[in-house]
Amino acid sequence: MDDDNGLELSLGLSCGGSTGKAKGNNNNNAGSSSENYRAEGGDRSAKVIDDFKNFLHPTSQRPAEPSSGSQRSDSGQQPPQNFFNDLSKAPTTEAEASTKPLWVEDESRKEAGNKRKFGFPGMNDDKKKEKDSSHVDMHEKKTKASHVSTATDEGSTAENEDVAESEVGGGSSSNHAKEVVRPPTDTNIVDNLTGQRRSNHGGSGTEEFTMRNMSYTVPFTVHPQNVVTSMPYSLPTKESGQHAAATSLLQPNANAGNLPIMFGYSPVQLPMLDKDGSGGIVALSQSPFAGRVPSNSATAKGEGKQPVAEEGSSEDASERPTGDNSNLNTAFSFDFSAIKPGMAADVKFGGSGARPNLPWVSTTGSGPHGRTISGVTYRYNANQIKIVCACHGSHMSPEEFVRHASEEYVSPESSMGMTAASAHT
């Protein structure tokens, strides 16, 4: 036996000659097999190189393949370094050729990209211009709207100032009040009345006349010689002196909104029916004063359909009778002889006490149940007065007041009766 190094491992036997021959044959076979192996390796490397070249340059012409015999002889003569030399040489030349079109493509792409970039700024400029123009338009619209709104506000304030100036009445007086006139055409009437008052009274001792449209409309307002009212009818009045004129200012009462209107009178002033047949009511007064309205729950039990107005300083047109002032206390009379001015001596008051400055009247009933009752008069409308009895707080006409005095007395439902003259501020 021999190993790879040619060492003889066989035993020393008699067949030594045969072993020597075999060794020589084996050496020859080993040399030929190594040459064959090298030739086949060279063929394979040449094929790999050719395939690589064909892959890099598919259009290049492939060289004629030599026969296998020549390849084997060439490969046997070529040293083993040719394979590496070919690999180092071929890729460099072919890589240079293959990279050229790639650089061309990159340059073309860059040029196209630059063209696109040059195209976009123009579009961007157009878009910016459009946005700027739209912003300018919006700003102009806003400024126009603001000018319009300020103009309307200025117009409205000017109108309000004109209305306020038109509502202010002329005249020099010690008492001034706000004047609210509805509709605006009534301002002419007020101006005319102011001029007439100045010419008639000379501006001495007169008070300013004011009109006021309340939520609950006052049915009438009387001024001497000049009847001013929001109703289609007028009241006949007379004037015999300079100081008999009075003004009326009605104010709503916030405590009781369903009580009738109460007019204040002086202690010697009582309303009386006009005997001339005109149907109007004339009130006689001596001096102005401030009267108040009873706003108690007991006074609300009557008819209670007229709104309440609290008197600040209220007087109607008055007539001064002939004679001295001492006769004023006895010069008044009602058509109903049973009703007399003043109050009964036994009338009791609750709440804050009596109000002697109210227009009190009293009457004595007839019959078995007749008694003396007292009440406060007030003007119900232009042609009628009513009386609020102190015993029950009922609103009734003079005839009903007389009949009420003749009826049997029934205690009021609440303990707060007989407080018709009490006022709550």
From Swiss-Prot:
Transmembrane segments: none annotated. It comes from the Eukaryota. Belongs to the Ninja family. Acts as a transcriptional repressor. Negative regulator of jasmonate responses. Connects the JAZ proteins and the non-JAZ protein TIFY8 with the TOPLESS corepressors. Pfam families: TDBD. Induction: By jasmonate. This is AFP homolog 2. Residues 146-158, 185-197, 288-299 have a biased composition (Polar residues). It comes from Arabidopsis thaliana. Residues 322-425 are annotated as: Necessary and sufficient for the interaction with the JAZ proteins. Component of a complex at least composed of TOPLESS, TPR2, TPR3, TIFY4B/PPD2, MYC3/ATR2 and TIFY3B/JAZ12. Interacts (via C-terminus) with TIFY10A/JAZ1; TIFY10B/JAZ2; TIFY6B/JAZ3; TIFY6A/JAZ4; TIFY11A/JAZ5; TIFY11B/JAZ6; TIFY7/JAZ9; TIFY9/JAZ10; TIFY3A/JAZ11; TIFY3B/JAZ12; TIFY4A/PPD1; TIFY4B/PPD2 and TIFY8 (via TIFY domain). Interacts with TOPLESS. Interacts with PAT1H1. Residues 7-17 are annotated as: Necessary and sufficient for the interaction with TOPLESS. The lineage of its organism: Eukaryota, Viridiplantae, Streptophyta, Embryophyta, Tracheophyta. InterPro entries: Ninja_fam, TDBD. Residues 37-54, 124-140 have a biased composition (Basic and acidic residues).
